[in-house]
Regions:
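Residue-level recognition of tetratricopeptide repeat
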Residues: 16, 47-52, 85, 117-122, ...
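Helix-coil-helix junctions within alpha-helical repeat/solenoid scaffolds
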Residues: 242-322
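"A position-specific structural signal for the A-helix of alpha-solenoid helical repeats
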Residues: 15, 22, 55, 87-95, ...
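Inter-helical turn/loop elements of alpha-helical hairpins
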Residues: 23-40, 44-103, 130-142, 207-210, ...
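Alpha-helical repeat scaffolds
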Residues: 40, 68-80, 103-116, 139-154, ...
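Residue at a conserved register position within TPR or TPR-like alpha-solenoid repeats
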Residues: 27, 60, 96, 130-133, ...
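TPR-adjacent "capping" and linker segments in tetratricopeptide-repeat scaffold/adaptor proteins
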Residues: 2-19, 76-87, 301-309
């Protein structure tokens, strides 16, 4: 039996499937482009291997392609009966999450990590602003997030992806001095990680280093595909710093090319929230925002989020509609 990059057994005998699956996980954790095609290569090499089907379904969910989730998830469930207990538990937990069964999924995820703390595809669900903790709305979630990442340090502390997430958890509770060496170590191992670069930008912001932050993230994104899951959002950071420094031409240029509908290639929640928030911040800074820009993002919000239910999206949609 083969293993993934975390030395966990995976149920395939195909070296090509193993290599492609490992590559898919790496791309997923780095918010890189080509996640779907890489998992599809693993499937092509061994269609009976359940986890690439699951990874593809999870990517579709993250990308906002909800209609595409069901088929690969069903295939993963059909195939995993003969796999290892860890793989079976991973399919169960992520399946609950993708079906919108949040409380059941969270219970399954925490139980899974108690037994398999190096299962990053499960740990990832509870990391960052959009994770199950950060997106929960619970009071004290920042401290809860740090407690969660801290519990995994003995198991994943030397991993570049985990280091980026632990650094962000430290930032969120104001422990910037502790976060800096952690994110620097992460980026030293994988300097092209979208998650790492994004969190490094947050550290620049928290330290009040606007010029250095803009220079860093603007240069970094030059080599980042627009298909990357975080391209829209790191571009938002560029536009926001350009606004702060009074470079309105750059702000509008980046917004139109890489953040707003028609320019960005990103999950709809990022396009809508980043565009609405940037327009609002421009107005707060005393700049005129043409009405047609607000109309365009209002129309996009109506199209992609026609019903309320996601508080983060709803608040930004309200800005767009105001």
């Amino acid at each position: 039996m083969r293993q993934d990059q975390y030395n966990q057994p995976i149920s395939t005998t195909s070296e090509a499937a193993q290599d492609a699956y490992i590559n898919g996980i790496t791309r997923f954790l780095a918010a890189d482009a080509g996640i779907d095609t890489t998992f599809q290569r693993a499937i092509a090499a061994d269609d009976s291997f359940a986890l690439p089907h699951l990874g593809l379904a999870r990517f579709y969910q993250m990308r906002g392609r909800g209609a595409d989730v069901a088929a690969p998830l069903a295939r993963a469930r059909a195939l995993v009966a003969d796999a290892t207990p860890r793989e079976q538990a991973q399919v169960n937990a992520l399946g609950l999450l993708m079906e919108g069964k949040g409380p059941q999924a969270y219970a399954a995820i925490r139980a899974h990590l108690a037994e398999y703390p190096r299962d990053v595809m499960i740990a990832q669900t509870c990391m960052g602003v959009f994770g199950m903790i950060g997106f929960s709305g619970r009071r004290g979630r920042e401290a809860e997030q740090l407690a969660f990442t801290s519990s995994l340090v003995p198991h994943l502390g030397d991993d570049w992806w985990f280091q980026s997430q632990h650094a962000f958890a430290l930032l969120e509770v104001g422990r910037t001095a502790e976060a800096e060496p952690v994110i620097e170590q992460s980026l030293a191992t994988n300097p092209r990680s979208g998650n790492g670069a994004h969190i490094r930008a947050h550290l620049y912001y928290e330290n009040g280093e606007a010029e250095a932050g803009l220079r860093y993230i603007d240069e970094w994104r030059n080599g980042y595909s627009k298909e990357g899951l975080l391209h829209c959002h790191v571009s938002w950071h560029v536009a926001l710093w350009a606004l702060e420094q009074g470079d309105l031409a750059k702000m509008w240029s980046v917004l139109d090319a890489d953040v707003a509908p028609g320019g960005a290639e990103a999950p709809p929640i990022n396009i809508m929230t980043d565009t609405a928030s940037l327009l609002y911040r421009a107005e707060l800074a005393g700049h005129d925002v043409p009405a047609e820009r607000w109309s365009a993002i209002s129309d996009y919000a109506k199209q992609c989020f026609p019903k309320p239910g996601i508080a983060f999206a709803d608040a930004h949609a309200a800005l767009a509609h105001a």
